[in-house]
Every structure is written in structure tokens, then in C-alpha cells.
């Protein structure tokens, strides 16, 4: 599935995955139209933060990924993404947070295996964020 969805290029060096926090609550509380609006805003935030160094995709439900060319810029882009999200929350108060994970793309590894590693990092991030509250 991922191989068909993602246009993996030789210059892609890292896979970043993002999963929205408590997105079901937004759909259940405010309706699917509000949920769709949140998804559009998140997609726009991703584009603003990452498009210079990668390609952004929605890969299902409330999950997004970025094929990233410049791993050395990853921390900068991640901080920029979270800053943009916080700025957007001022006008769209129901905007959810996003949990984040990344993995370097290994030459002999399938993209599915890379995604599994990125997912494991993302779920660790999600767990740590919940415990910090």
C-alpha cells in the first residue's frame, strides 16, 4: 500500500509520521465537518513546515507522513510545525495536537519496515506526551 501511495525517490532519506491526538473526540463532539476542517489545517501546517525539504501525504484517517530529503533539518522543521500548530490554535481552538515519529530510510529495507520503525517512535512520543500532562 505505501509503495503505491508514496512516490519514494532516491533522495528521500527519512520517513516522518504524524498521528493526530484525540481526533475521534473532535469528530464526535463537533461533527465530521469540523474534523475535515482540522485535517485541512493540519495538512497546510505540514506543507508550510516541510515542503522545502520533503513531500507530505495523508495516508489515512488522521495519519500523515513526510518523505524527507534532509535529515539534518528534521529538528528545525518539527519545531516549525509545532509552532505553526500552536499559532493556528488561537483561531481554531479545537485543533488537535499531533504525535510525531521518524526513521531513517535504510537502503535494503522496505518502506513498510521503515514505517513500522517510525510508528514505534511516534507511539513512544504519544505515550510520553500523555504522561507529561
Tell me what each language-model feature is.
Residues 20-21, 71:
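PAS/PAC or PAS-like capping segment
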Residues 126-129:
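Signal-transmission coiled-coil "S-helix"-like helices
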Residues 11-13, 54, 98, 131:
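PAS-family sensory domain
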Amino acid at each position: 500500500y505505501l509503495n503505491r501511495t508514496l512516490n519514494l525517490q532516491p533522495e528521500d532519506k527519512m520517513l516522518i509520521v504524524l498521528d493526530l491526538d484525540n481526533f475521534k473526540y473532535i469528530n464526535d463532539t463537533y461533527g465530521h465537518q469540523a474534523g475535515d476542517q482540522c485535517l485541512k489545517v493540519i495538512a497546510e501546517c505540514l506543507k508550510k513546515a516541510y515542503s522545502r525539504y520533503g513531500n507530505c501525504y495523508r495516508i489515512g484517517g488522521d495519519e500523515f507522513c513526510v518523505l524527507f530529503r534532509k535529515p539534518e533539518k528534521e529538528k528545525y522543521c518539527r519545531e516549525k510545525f509545532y509552532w505553526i500548530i500552536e499559532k493556528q490554535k488561537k483561531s481554531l481552538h479545537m485543533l488537535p495536537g499531533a504525535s510525531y515519529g521518524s526513521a531513517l530510510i535504510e537502503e535494503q529495507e522496505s518502506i513498510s519496515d521503515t514505517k513500522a520503525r517510525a510508528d514505534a517512535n511516534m507511539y513512544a512520543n504519544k505515550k510520553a506526551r500523555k504522561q507529561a500532562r
